[in-house]
């Protein structure tokens, strides 16, 4: 089937967005590397946001300088940026392969007017690509602001980046469609093709990688928000640290609920987020170990350690619930429909045995005989049809 004008417009606009995404990915790789070296337009090294050698948990915020609170240091920040760069690169490769798959399938398997639109919606629609572009752009802006040591502006920019990333992963999993629309879209996917392989194998891998990044983004969002709070209000540094840990814990719990009640309807295997939560737990635990003296002097060592330990405990509990509901088939909602029968219902063809009615009395039999003689027998349907056909034949012969 030849592609219509609307299909050609969808394909061309989708490829153009993919081209812009590739350019944005190159820029997102260049900006962190350029911000690492001096003399390239960045005033400060963006990784050294605070001086942890002056960390004091018993003092309050001072408006004269940047009060050090809990944040990512140089190794953790580099790991986060490098992992984000790797995940975005894998996603760009996936989208390029998706464009090749759609181009190869449109000449052979585009049998309906909705085929190409369904393919693009399942692989990654225009809105998903556009949000992915905004996500990479906001990450570059965050690095720019960090290099200028604007803590409040950096927290605001990263809040925007986190919201965009949340919308992106939600749209990628749900395909921006209702649950009942997904099977209808999948009916247009041809079997044993490159497109089917991308949807069944590579897209789940890409989604799980994005989920691991989402968990790390929750951690960085919590740390940047509480750093902005700690440098804006007259609060203890320890309160800002407790707030960051509890905020990260609350965000993960919200995502667990979102996964169990909504996202599992679209994709069952979601392990990337749990891996990201464990990595975030290790990142939070490193400052407690690295700056143990500061926590011990403030008598907060055990309290912070116990508070941070709640993160992996709840994560393990969420994994157990996911295994119970997914692999063991327990607590799964029943289908809202009844399956059709595979074979026709059997009909009982046993002959019915009619019992002989009891004999009538003599007077009744005599009356019935008189009635039969006086009343002519009714004509059957066959006799009526036969007589009508003969009358028509006679009329035709007379006419001839």
Curated annotation (Swiss-Prot):
Compartment(s): Virion membrane; Host Golgi apparatus, Host trans-Golgi network; Host endosome membrane; Host nucleus inner membrane
Annotated stretches, region: Disordered: 348-394
Intravirion-side segments: 1-16, 98-113, 174-208, 256-270, 322-400
Taxonomy, superkingdom: Viruses
Keyword check for Thylakoid: no
This protein's UniProt keywords: Disulfide bond, Glycoprotein, Host endosome, Host Golgi apparatus, Host membrane, Host nucleus, Membrane, Transmembrane, Transmembrane helix, Viral envelope protein, Virion
Gene field: gM
Protein name (record): Envelope glycoprotein M
Subunit annotation: Interacts (via N-terminus) with gN (via N-terminus). The gM-gN heterodimer forms the gCII complex.
Membrane topology, Virion surface segments: 38-76, 135-152, 230-234, 292-300
One GO cellular component, as annotated: viral envelope
Entry membrane topology: Multi-pass membrane protein
Processing and modification events after translation: N-glycosylated.
Family: Belongs to the herpesviridae glycoprotein M family.
Function comment: Envelope glycoprotein important for virion assembly and egress. Plays a role in the correct incorporation of gH-gL into virion membrane. Directs the glycoprotein N (gN) to the host trans-Golgi network.
InterPro entries in alphabetical order: Herpes_glycop_M
Transmembrane segments: 17-37, 77-97, 114-134, 153-173, 209-229, 235-255, 271-291, 301-321
């Amino acid at each position: 089937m030849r592609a219509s004008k609307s299909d050609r417009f969808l394909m061309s606009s989708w490829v153009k967005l993919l081209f812009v995404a590739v350019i944005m990915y190159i820029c997102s790789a260049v900006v962190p590397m350029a911000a690492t070296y001096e003399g390239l337009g960045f005033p400060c090294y963006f990784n050294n946001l605070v001086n942890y050698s002056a960390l004091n948990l018993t003092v309050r915020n001072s408006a004269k300088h940047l009060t050090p609170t809990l944040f990512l240091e140089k190794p953790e920040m580099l790991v986060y940026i490098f992992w984000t760069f790797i995940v975005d690169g894998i996603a760009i490769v996936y989208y390029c392969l998706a464009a090749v798959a759609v181009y190869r399938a449109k000449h052979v398997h585009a049998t309906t007017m909705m085929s190409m639109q369904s393919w693009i919606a399942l692989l990654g629609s225009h809105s998903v690509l556009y949000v992915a572009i905004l996500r990479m752009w906001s990450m570059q802006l965050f690095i720019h602001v960090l290099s200028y040591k604007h803590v409040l502006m950096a927290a605001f920019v990263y809040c925007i980046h986190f919201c965009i990333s949340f919308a992106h992963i939600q749209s990628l999993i749900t395909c921006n469609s209702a649950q009942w629309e997904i099977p209808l879209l999948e009916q247009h996917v041809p079997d044993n093709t490159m497109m089917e392989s991308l949807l069944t194998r590579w897209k789940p891998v890409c989604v799980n990688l994005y989920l691991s990044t989402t968990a790390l983004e929750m951690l960085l969002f919590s740390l940047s928000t509480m750093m902005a709070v700690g440098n804006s209000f007259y609060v203890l540094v320890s309160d800002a640290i407790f707030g960051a840990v509890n905020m990260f814990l609350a965000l993960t719990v919200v995502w667990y609920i979102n996964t169990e009640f909504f996202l599992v309807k679209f994709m069952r295997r979601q392990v990337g987020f749990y891996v990201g939560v464990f990595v975030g737990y290790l990142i939070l635990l490193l400052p407690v170990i690295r700056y143990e003296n500061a926590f011990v002097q403030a008598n907060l060592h055990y309290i912070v350690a116990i508070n941070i330990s709640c993160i992996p405990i709840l994560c393990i509990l969420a994994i157990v619930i996911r295994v119970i509901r997914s692999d063991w088939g327990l607590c799964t909602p029943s289908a809202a429909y009844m399956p059709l029968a595979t074979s026709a219902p059997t009909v009982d063809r046993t002959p019915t045995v009619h019992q002989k009615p009891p004999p009538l009395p003599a007077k009744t039999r005599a009356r019935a005989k008189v009635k039969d003689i006086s009343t002519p027998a009714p004509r059957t349907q066959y006799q009526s049809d036969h007589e009508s056909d003969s009358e028509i034949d006679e009329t035709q012969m007379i006419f001839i």
